[in-house]
Amino acid sequence: MDRDLNEDDSVVDLSFEAESPLAPPTELLERLPSYDWLLQGGRGQIFFPPLEAPGRPQEQRSWPSFLEHRVPAMTEEVAREALLSFVDSKCCYSSTVAGDLVIQELKRQTLCRYRLETFSESRISEWTFQPFTNHSVDGPQRGASPRLWDIKVQGPPMFQEDTRKFQVPHSSLVKECHKCHGRGRYKCSGCHGAGTVRCPSCCGAKRKAKQSRRCQLCAGSGRRRCSTCSGRGNKTCATCKGEKKLLHFIQLVIMWKNSLFEFVSEHRLNCPRELLAKAKGENLFKDENSVVYPIVDFPLRDISLASQRGIAEHSAALASRARVLQQRQTIELIPLTEVHYWYQGKTYVYYIYGTDHQVYAVDYPERYCCGCTIV
């Protein structure tokens, strides 16, 4: 169960990132013994989610009612209109072919696409810091830090990926900046604190080689103002932003991820599988719950096997490192038609796929490139 946090346990949203020393202050970890692993130089540690009791499997479904769905039949008129729309979207394809071709044969096939989405949440802790600006410090003196899975946060909508960072309550400690040693500024590396550098024109000689007059760039001084620090000899510390102190704390990183498994049933036509994976289909079945179970007894055995394989893969990949929040599995019908047509004594082929009649034409005649016809 989630632990209710009081007002002192409020979670601060973070957006600051800075250069980090090799290890966190030992004083901080002495007060936070559960985070002592950071002393070994750990960048971040995954905290395993609490185990939850599995739900009960759903009842066996009656598939015949689902299979009553049918996509509209492909006709020669629809096939020609689909090709005309495709040609109109291409600058180098002749529309004459689409208007004059003779359709000889339509080979239709309906495919099934199975898709499994698993929306999960993982939590990682890491040590970080930011410039201290004299605001109140939420340190261990205010109480014990909550366990990372007890911290309540508002997550994104289901199946929408996101990453957010939060400050762990009661984990803060103020220390002198390790970069500038509490000065807020440090010596410029360009001029070593002098504020000036050797003139690049005369190389510090005050005069150019084989010339008697003084160097015009440095006015004969042999030195130029340092461009790195604008002549000040020092720079504001980039780590503490001139504040001289740093606020060290434990940071909680929460990642919401949507894992995807897809499978398209086998087909006998030569349309590329990657196009079919992205095709728009007609929804045949949808199952969404905190946990979904493998589909059984589907008329296409490959779909049932894909469902079993996808759920097993996601379970194995996420069980030990993330909390599954929601799962969704769908089956879609993808219509596919192979169109054989005749044009000027030759036979060609194109494919119409998806419910929105997308076209794949690999050998379309009368294509143009920069005004030249591709034969």
Curated annotation (Swiss-Prot):
Which tissues carry this protein? Answer: Expressed in enterocytes of small and large intestinal mucosa (at protein level). Expressed in chromaffine and interstitial cells. Expressed in peripheral blood and gingival cells.
- Per its UniProt entry, which superkingdom is the organism in? Eukaryota
Tell me if Nucleus is a UniProt keyword of this record: yes
Per the record, the coiled-coil ranges are none
Main location per UniProt?
cytoplasm
GO annotations under biological process? odontogenesis
Q: What is the recorded phenotype of mutating P140Q?
A: Found in patients with dentin dysplasia; likely pathogenic; decreased protein abundance; no effect on nuclear localization
Query: What are the annotated disulfide bridges?
Result: none
One example GO MF annotation = unfolded protein binding
GO terms for cellular component: cytoplasm; nucleus
Which residue spans traverse the membrane? none
Q: Where in the cell is it found?
A: Cytoplasm; Nucleus
Please provide the record's keywords in A-Z order.
Cytoplasm, Disease variant, Nucleus
Summarizing the function annotation, the protein's role is: Plays a role in odontogenesis.
Instruction: State the associated disorder.
Output: Defects in SSUH2 are associated with dentin dysplasia, a genetic disorder characterized by severe tooth hypermobility, short dental roots, and obliterated pulp chambers.
Q: What is this protein called?
A: Protein SSUH2 homolog
Please tell me the species this chain comes from. Answer: Homo sapiens (Human)
Q: Which gene encodes it?
A: SSUH2
